[in-house]
Amino acid sequence: MGRSISVSFGLLVVFLSLSGTGADQDCLPGWSSHEGHCYKVFNLDKTWEDAEKFCTEQANSGHLVSIDSKKEANFVAELVSQNIKETRRTDFVWIGLRAEDKRQHCSSEWSDGSSINYQNWIEAESKKCLGLEKQTRYRKWVNLNCGQPYRFTCEI
């Protein structure tokens, strides 16, 4: 009897210690939790606009991923590397950032409306949409043609 209470108490302590750490983040099945947000790599080829629309249809607050820190960039890069299915279109993965016009390097906010607090461009070109590049292990942002279909990562 005393042993059973000890085990139950131990499990309660573990549960309570995980509460509030992000470990209790409720994500949809197949989604991964990181610092209060949920992420999923989709192995579907879509244009930037279609990928963004698809992400908004996943949940009320869904968008293409916005990357706000090096820590989040590393998490997303690892998630993409582990979940992307190899095809000829896996060299790039859409993120939620694009230029408002060709004269601008980028818009002033991510597709979810948040400000750009972290930047990690590999090069500057005149294309409007940004993605992660396989050659950099999905850690650097590259300018891409918005109309090309690539895989993508959603965040809710």
Curated annotation (Swiss-Prot):
Q: PROSITE patterns recorded for this chain? A: C_TYPE_LECTIN_1 (PS00615), C_TYPE_LECTIN_2 (PS50041)
What is the predominant subcellular site recorded for this chain?
secreted
Q: List the disulfide bonds.
A: C27-C38, C55-C154, C129-C146
The protein's matches in InterPro entries, at most eight in alphabetical order, are given as: C-type_lectin-like, C-type_lectin-like/link_sf, C-type_lectin/snaclec_domain, C-type_lectin_CS, CTDL_fold
Q: What keywords does the record list, in alphabetical order?
A: Disulfide bond, Hemostasis impairing toxin, Secreted, Signal, Toxin
Which residue range or ranges hold the C-type lectin domain? 34-155
Q: Name one GO molecular function term.
A: toxin activity
Q: Does the keyword Disulfide bond apply?
A: yes
**Pfam families named in the record:** Lectin_C
Tissue specificity remark: Expressed by the venom gland.
Miscellaneous notes for this chain?
Shows greater sequence similarity to the alpha than beta subunits compared to other heterodimer snaclecs.
The free-text function statement in the UniProt record for this protein reads: Interferes with one step of hemostasis (modulation of platelet aggregation, or coagulation cascade, for example).
What does the subunit comment say?
Heterodimer; disulfide-linked.
Name of the featured protein: Snaclec A1
